[in-house]
Amino acid sequence: MTTHSAFARNQWYVAAWAHEVGRDLLGRTVLGEPLALYRTQEGKAVALADRCVHRRFPLSESRLDGDKVVCGYHGFTYDTTGTCVFVPGQKRVPRTARVSSYPVAEVDAFVWVWIGDPEAADPTTIPRAPHLADDGWVTVTGMEPVDCDYGLLVDNLMDLSHETYLHGGYIGTPEVAETPITTEVDEEAGIVRVS
């Protein structure tokens, strides 16, 4: 059975700001996939499916023991590859006891995840934003929950010409509406650049 999505699965997606991913488990959803993100003791970012194979308990609400995630419900323990390495009360761990792990890349100030075919994950295709991690630039970060369809946000964030008319006086100026827009399409990489 083929599943259809409005989003391409074989693409890199930002899962978090790099500073958000640490030694505490962080839950995020990317393309409808719940993820548990964390860093190993050496600082490498990890992304696992955020549901224990046993009772579907969120691993992001569990705890770390070294580099392993210990489920907060019954103690099933997973390594960084998503393989269950310990089940309390059992001498043998079932071969099928594993959660999905996802390719992760940390580029500039972001932790990126690849939800699609892991063999196709190429970190060199990640769009760069080096200024975000450059001390010569000021970057303001934050989250703003908005109760709307993602399409409305995309439409508004990609259409800067409306700033002059709707947001005039504080972020919109006549120069914004007059600025030429350049669009580049890299079909091979699956990237659209607008500047």
Question: What are the roles of these predicted feature ranges?
Answer:
Residues 49:
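A glycine-rich beta-to-alpha transition motif near the start of alpha/beta enzyme domains, typified by
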Residues 68:
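Conserved sequence/structural motifs within the catalytic ATP-binding
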Residues 1-45, 65, 77-195:
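Rieske [2Fe-2S] iron-sulfur-binding subdomain
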Residues 52, 71:
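Short cysteine-rich clusters marking metal-coordination/redox-active sites
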Residues 56-61:
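Conserved HGGG/HGGXW glycine-rich cap/lid loop of the alpha/beta-hydrolase fold
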